Amino acid sequence: MILILFYIILLFEIINGIWCLYRVIRYNNHNNKLTENSNESKLENSKILIVIPCLREQDIIISTLQHFLKLTSNYENIKILVVTTQKEEYEKQKYLYLQDDLKEDVKNNIDIKKMITKYNKILSTMELKDILKLKLNNNIDRIVENKVKNSKTTSKIVEEYIESRKLRDKVYHKHYPNNEGIMADQLNYVLNNFNFIDEGNYYYSVYNADSIPSENTIKEILKTIEKNKQPKVIQQYSAPISNWNNLSAIMKGFAIYQSNFELRYGLINSNIPNRLLYTYVVGHGMYIRVDVLKKIGGFETKYWCEDIYMSYVLRTKNIPICPIKTLELMQSPQYLSILTRQNAVWFKTSFECLKIFKDVFRKNKKINLNSLGWMIQRLRMNMTWFGLPIAFLYTIIVAILNQNIGILTVATLTYLSMILLEYGSIIRLLENTSKIKLGNKFKILLYTTAAATISNIGPIYSLISQKKEKYKTIR
């Protein structure tokens, strides 16, 4: 029985690798046909509101705003809105008591990763790094006190920037007034408090504070709206490689691992419509018509990842996701500890897929093939995410216990073949789509192999920690 399971795992790995390679090849063929048949079209004058929700984004929000202003400078029908939250100010005041601990940790030369995790609610990452540069200064206590005292919230920084540059006709700012809540609450606050005129011709777009969509994004979005006669949902998928050169080897591996998910289940599956394939929207790079968004009840606040819930709702209502080819480049976490917590947040909502299924059923009182297909696929993905590294470990342990170098070699080569077929094809697709050369492919595959082998650290942490509060990814 042990060896039967061993060979079943090996068979699954080979099938998975071949299936992944096949879908990339099919996408490339499909994409080439679209390119050959594409024509320039008149850009529809649909209105777009780009919403950027922020919580402790002091370090990057201005550069992000500058990027979006440049991106939309030629379009009067596109506006930008930053929505901050009172939660940021509330938590800063709540954790000010840590100031004395911070002074001691600076003097004791505590690791920067630990300091960022512990003190991110009272100082930004850049502010903490600035303090560490002066750690040998005799007046370090005063330096810390002044830094904390003069630290500005994201809301304050945004307001000052808009006012000083006279941007109120192009950039709006709304401030979610509650001390609690998650990103979905901020997004719903905008949905309910912004004056959308002609909702069927107005798109509500969401981007993160670290989003860097390319110059071609807006053009392709408007062409997609025109070509598809105002589709209900448009999605720009992403790749976390904007800070590629600042990542360690293992974190580069995880950047490819995450890009694989985005491109395979997002870009590829959305371009090849099939009820058996899993498709999803992401909480950044999404464009959804305001009338549709209001009809489905806005953004779900019961679950930490509102996009997983929305993906299911769209699937049950048979609302297709219209993808664009241009990728959004975003940051990848620089530290494994931060990535683990980020993945734990994603897995928590994913793990609650049966609960989501029941919640939506109570509202709609009906089940269709789309909803069943989504749930089955999500369960399969959860099992793969959590179980594949364990399955590989199982094959290695079985080979060692049997003291059989032959099956150890087969187990290792089968796993590496799966990695090569799955991620080798994705690395090439990622480079072609993003127009960025990532470097030595052999090294990247080694990094990705290491990351894939421990890719269930987030799910494991999620099940063990049982955190009651959503983790905010630290930039």
Residue spans for each PLM region:
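Short, acidic, metal-binding catalytic loop of nucleotide-sugar glycosyltransferases
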Residues: 66-77, 86-89, 101-104
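Short beta-strand-to-loop acidic/aromatic patch adjacent to the donor-nucleotide binding site
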Residues: 198-212
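Hydrophobic targeting segments
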Residues: 46-53, 65-68, 78-84, 173, ...
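Juxtamembrane C-terminal module of membrane proteins
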Residues: 19-45, 359-375, 402-475
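Active-site-proximal specificity loops/subdomain of glycosyltransferases
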Residues: 92-201
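Catalytic donor-sugar/metal-binding loop of nucleotide-sugar-dependent glycosyltransferases
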Residues: 302, 311-329
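Long helical/loop segments within the catalytic core of UDP-sugar-dependent glycosyltransferases
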Residues: 162-166, 182-198, 215-303, 344-355, ...
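Short, well-formed alpha-helical segments that are part of the catalytic scaffolds
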Residues: 57-70, 90-94
